[in-house]
Amino acid sequence: MSFFGFGQTAEIDIVLNDAETRKKVEHKTEDGKKDKYFLFYDGETVSGKVNVTLKTPGKRLEHYGIKIEFVGQIELYYDRGNHHEFVSLVKDLARPGELSQSQTFDFEFTHVEKPYESYTGQNVKLRYFLRATISRRLNDISKEMDIVVQTLCTYPEINSSIKMEVGIEDCLHIEFEYNKSKYHLRDVIVGKIYFLLVRIKIKHMEIDIIKRETTGTGPSVYHENDTIAKYEIMDGAPVRGESIPIRLFLAGYEMTPTMRDINKKFSVRYYLNLVLIDEEERRYFKQQEITLWRKGDIVRRSMSQQATIAAQRYEGSNPEPTSAQAKEETD
Amino acid sequence: MAEAIADTRRLYTKPQNLNDAYGPPSNFLEIDVTNPETVGVGRNRFTTYEIKLKTNLPIFKLKESRVRRRYSDFEWLRGELERESKVVVPPLPGKALFRQLPFRGDDGIFDDSFIEERRQGLEQFLNKVAGHPLAQNERCLHMFLQDESVDKNYTPSKIRQA
């Protein structure tokens, strides 16, 4: 109808109530570009306004209902038709009728569950978005607004180190050690490689971080490997008894938390690959999985709070914050 | 109290034994292909090369050895390794059949520059192969490098270290 210049059409605009204060983060889109989106956590309320602006003033807009949805869905690139929605909430904004002028509708999705982190990968995408729709006889008018969700963790209670002896019999024996098995995204991998037997001519050694995205189930499982980082840790030939230190700062690399079997649709796992290269370019390697997790931002506490905590932990210490210091530290 | 800065101190390491640190490395293996010599007369001539090996790897029976081999021996070795081991065997320098055709302006396969080119290729080939942990387990490699002559009727087998 609007095709021929007859009838009325409208523009939809979704605005969040806390748009001024809410943090925005960068997130990669499918074609590799980076855009900024509002950041939400699990359990947070999503509320705002839907502004419907009539294009042609004076004319009425007939509709079969106006609604807003909050959707969390997984999209497999090789199966575009099927979106797997794991969160789907609807709020009706207007019953079927007509709008004689531009109007604004309030909405609130209270304490929405957002179980998984937003992810845009090589073969799969998990996204959350608001979608406002004006239903009409021939064609609906709708507008989507993507948001980004991050899942936070606290320090894992158990975080054992990884220590293993590997090698090729009578040729090369090494013992490698990484200080933890679970690292947060801005952590440092501290480790060492200890040479027990070196009967080959090693030229250099590097440690790679590999991201493996797994999609599909059963017989049609597909792995996509991506080397996120290559970091040389040794140049030259080691001998028996030598220890090579590793210190790899993760903050410099673009990584996501480890995602295991998300909604039974996909996984994203990370591996450390230790690679030794000999004089004839032969490669000897050992892969080891690590778990990555996302840490919440550090909460800054006042000196008096910190002192109180310290007093509780260590017997006999006196919490004596000077009043001047306490004043400076309050945020 | 939340950590503001990660602990990046080195992990504990055992101090290295000074004999290990300053002694000879356990990976010493040197192979030279030298002294090409053409033997025979007329159509029955062929060139042999001296293969000198020095090593401290326990898998080699002799720590020093010296043998003479011809190109067809190298071809035999390559064939055996391809069949018996899972190694991707590097190529040999070319067979140069065209050089064996008559009416050439130079000495064909007995030309000095050709022999030198071939010598280099054979040396590269042997160094690549002899340093491979899997190739080192093959009887044929040890026979080629250290036995007086190559017995092409041998029984292929794997070497296990004592």
Curated annotation (Swiss-Prot), chain A:
The keyword S-adenosyl-L-methionine does not apply. InterPro entries: Arrestin-like_C (IPR014752), Vps26-related (IPR028934). It is found in: Cytoplasm; Membrane; Endosome. Keywords: Cytoplasm, Endosome, Membrane, Protein transport, Transport. Residues 310-331 are annotated as: Disordered. GO terms for biological process: intracellular protein transport; retrograde transport, endosome to Golgi. Pfam families: Vps26. GO terms for cellular component: cytosol; endosome; retromer complex. The keyword DNA repair does not apply. It is a peripheral membrane protein. Acts as a component of the retromer cargo-selective complex (CSC). The CSC is believed to be the core functional component of retromer or respective retromer complex variants acting to prevent missorting of selected transmembrane cargo proteins into the lysosomal degradation pathway. Retromer mediates retrograde transport of cargo proteins from endosomes to the trans-Golgi network (TGN). Belongs to the VPS26 family. Component of the heterotrimeric retromer cargo-selective complex (CSC) which is believed to associate with variable sorting nexins to form functionally distinct retromer complex variants. This is Vacuolar protein sorting-associated protein 26B. The gene is vps26b.
